[in-house]
Every structure is written in structure tokens, then in C-alpha cells.
Amino acid sequence: LRGEGGSNALDLPDVQKQGDFFVESPIILFAAVIWFLRIYKDGKYCTFPHAIELLNRRYEDVFPILTSYPELENYLSPFMDAWQGGAMEQLAGQIASAKIPLSRMISPQLYWVMSDSEFTLDINNPDEPKILCVGNNPDRQNIYGAALGLYNSRIVKLINKKGKLKSAVIIDELPTIYFKGLDNLIATARSNKVAVCLGFQDFSQLKRDYGDKEAAVVMNTVGNIFSGQVVGETAKTLSERFGKILQKRQSITINREDKSTSINTQMESLIPASKISTLTQGMFVGAVADNFNERIEQKIFHCEIVVDAEKVRREEQAYKPIPVITDFTDADGNDRMKEMIQENYNRIRAEVRQIVADELQRIQSDPELQHLLQNK
């Protein structure tokens, strides 16, 4: 993942605060850091770990370096004004807003995954198709969720194009990550042969983590819904989505003298919320969308989904082994994974220290840029 969309990692905890000063400021600062790394030596060091390490250097070093590039001068203008004007408390708040969420992602393991590129993320490339499977860790959900959201954002930009292979984006437990641009992907991906499949426990989870507006867009844009047992507002929402049907009601009145029968019609929920909230395991309700030339008469269903166990078994037997991308064993067969991951971590930190030293030396040697170091 090199130099694309890195500021999305800052969006996860603040998705409902877009436009807030202390939310936008760190995004701008981190975007400037990423842009610098793309410029510096043709992007040789433009990786997410390098960006984190550079951001965590002293701002007395980082600001002059970034400002020395005309392309980045406007990015840094608010920060330089605060620094030169002595607004140190404001400046500290802005910088901390960028450092704190990203500092949680500093780890040798994450640096290993997000540094060198073993493969490209255009998974539906006709010349080099891939299957990419990633998972979150419940113990570090917020940390890895930001990293996964960053990958998702980049993948969506690459696969949602014409002339690619058919592909699918399948996400289970969606609320555990922030997927920037998910609503747009659902709305536009179908024309580019990209299927989007989202799994989550309840609509309330989506509203909590994505905000009411974005959650509503996601819920109302999807064309196919499969649901097991859910309760509360989710059950009511699904019941309303499935619509109503005209049903007959018959009532019988009996007294001493006679017996009367009345029949009337009334619009009732096709699948009541009470029924959705009491579904047993294996029972599903849902709705499917059709195409113009492939009409589906029965779009709403309430049934048991039967799994063909024998077919699943045959499919599992035909699985191919996962290719080894990186071999952590040495010539003697010893596992050196920890050592190699730590060496990569140390290398990235050393490279950033050298970048800062070289850039400060360049600025010091340039009479037109020396003034940037006067306030250092």
C-alpha cells in the first residue's frame, strides 16, 4: 500500500465529526506527509509505516522539511502560522490529533504487512487475478480496523473500473472497520461487475459506527437482503421493507338467537416484525432484486436455506494450497519470523531518521531555504 488514501486511517474514530477543526487539521497534516514521501526520491519510501514514523518526528524538523517543497507549502500554512505566531497550545493540539490515533498502529507486525508490496491490490486485473483475504483481531479491533479500512479504500478505487474481471467484495462484521466510500461502491459497482456482500448483526451497529446518515444510505441502497433472527428496530425496518399484502379477516359472532359472520380485508405486513424476531436457526427472510431480462416473480421469501453438505465437502477437497509469499525460515530450517519482522521495523525507523537528517542538511545548505530553520 504505497502513497494512496493514507489519511483514511484518521477517519475511523471521527466519522461523525466531519468538518470539525481538530478533525480536519490532522488529516491535512498527514496528507502533507504522504505527499512528501511520494515526491521524495520518486516515492521510494512512500509507505504507511514511513509516513507514521515521519509524522512522529519533532515538528521543529518536520515542518521546515515539508514547507521547503512548493507543492506542500499551502498544506503547512496553518501550522507554520501557529508555530511562528507562538500559538503553541493550538499547534500541540493539532499535532496530537494526528499522532495519537496513528501511534496506536505502531507495531513491528503491522509495519511488516504495510511496508513492502509483495503484490498489487487490483484483485480483478485480467492479467493477474487474485483472492485477498484479511481478518481483524477482536482484541485490537480499533487499531486493525483503521488499517483494514485503508486497504479497502484503495482496493475499491482499483477494482471499480471498466474492463476488469467479475469480482466480489465480501465483508463480514462490517461495523468492525470503517469502509470509506462504501455507499458509492454499492451504487456504482454493479455496472463494473463488482458484487458487494455485507454482513453484520444488526442495523443499530451500523448506525453506531457509521453515523445515521451513512448507515441509512447503505441500508437503502442494497438490492438484496438476507436476514436471520433480529429484533427491535431492525425487525421493524425489514418488515416495512418487505411491504404489505391485502389479507382477508373473518369474524364470527354467536349469541342466543343467531350467528353472524363478517369478512373484511385489511393491509397487513407480509412478514411481521414478530415473526422475524422469532426465526429459528436456518430460517431466513429476505428480498432479491432482478434484471430487466431476468424477471423474478417471487422477490420476497421466508424459508429454510438447506446446505448441500456433500457438495461443500467435495469443494473443500478441491481446495488448492495457499501460496507462500514470504518464507521466514533460513537455510538451516530455523524459523526467523520474529527477527525478520523486527529487522524490518528497525530498518524503517532508521530510513526515516536518515531522510530527516538529509533533508535538514539540504535546507541548511540552501541560502533560499535557510530561513525555515531560524525558528528551530
Stretches with model-predicted labels:
Residues L1-R2:
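Short, low-complexity S/T/E/D/G/P-rich linear segments that nucleate or cap local secondary structure
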Residues L12-V194, D209-Y210, I276-T280, V288-R295, ...:
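P-loop NTPase motor domains
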Residues P13, I186-T188, N192-A289:
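Conserved ATP-driven motor cores of ASCE-family P-loop NTPases powering translocation/secretion/packaging/pilus
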Residues K162-K166, L198-Q201, R249-E257, R313-P321:
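A generic structural motif
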Residues I300-H302:
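N-terminal charged/capping segments associated with class I S-adenosyl-L-methionine
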